[in-house]
Amino acid sequence: MALTPIGFGAWAIGGGNWEFAWGAQDDDESISAIHRALDVGINWIDTAAIYGLGHSEEIVGKALKAASHKPFIFTKCSMRWHQDRSIYRSLKAGSLAEELEGSLRRLGVETIDLYQVHWPNPEEEIEEGWAQLERFREQGKVRWLGVSNFSVEQMKRAQAIAPITSLQPPYSMLRRAIEAEILPFTQAHGIGVIYYSPMVSGLLTGKMTRDRIATLPADDWRRRAAEFNEPRLSRNLKLVELLREIGDGHGVTPGVVAVAWTLHHPAVTAAIVGGRSAQQVEQMAGALDFRLTDEEYGRIVGFLGDHPA
């Protein structure tokens, strides 16, 4: 499976009115964003059943019906919802079977390219859940198996049952914890790393200001996020100005620089980059090719060292 350096992240296009929403979203704009991502050369889409409580998968499915060519489709399981829209987690075999059928139906596909355990919860069900995913693979319903948000020890438990194709962790210049143990482990075991939030959920795009953050919709989870609030926000906005300075020298946005910084690490495979409109996708298309020099990478590392969280 040869992936482009960035993939289209479909979290935000799930829309509003659920616990981890990004606010209201126009479905036609979402479909246009997906089509534009494919047009600029992005060859994979990452979504999850829980995004918009199924709505993100439905929108991806609609976009695929009218797409000029078909990308790799990745989705995730283990987070479910009740009729009152409250979320619960399960890795029970029967629950996962129901989830898979729902995802296949919403996406309008017969096979999912990469099926991932979204979170290792409940932890005592990891083995049961991973064994069930391996059965899905044997049945031809999924092609590859991945995990998301797993620790090294949790990956070892899964590996004892069936191989792991990929890990999906958070990774950005503000969230570097995986560099210590997780990336050395995945590199040693041939596990791909497709990571989320390289731009810290939009914070490093260059579009976020204090005023914009203050007026985020009430159902936008970022209003509660530590990086979007003091005491971290001031440091983060200064970091964006450094990214802007570097990007201006190459004609790219701060967001493209932020993604390029993460892609500089030799143990990562590709970055998940969200887009809520065709225009946003076009602004990020430069991340397919742009790379930082070692000197530019070091300038950012130096700033982070001088301005700890």
Language-model regions: role of each:
Residues 2, 61-72, 104-108, 137, ...:
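Acidic (Asp/Glu)-rich catalytic clusters
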Residues 70-83:
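A short, structured active-site edge motif that brings together acidic residues
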Residues 104-122:
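Active-site groove signature of glycoside hydrolases
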Residues 14-20, 80-87, 204:
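A short acidic, helix-capping loop that chelates divalent metal ions and anchors anionic groups
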Residues 1-71:
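N-terminal binding-site loop/beta-alpha segment at the start of enzyme catalytic domains
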Residues 120-307:
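Beta/alpha (TIM)-barrel catalytic core signal, keyed to glycine-rich beta->alpha loops juxtaposed to Asp/Glu
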Residues 23-37, 91-107, 151-157:
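Short, acidic/polar
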Residues 21-29, 55, 59, 87-98, ...:
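Alpha-helix N-cap and loop-to-helix initiation/capping positions
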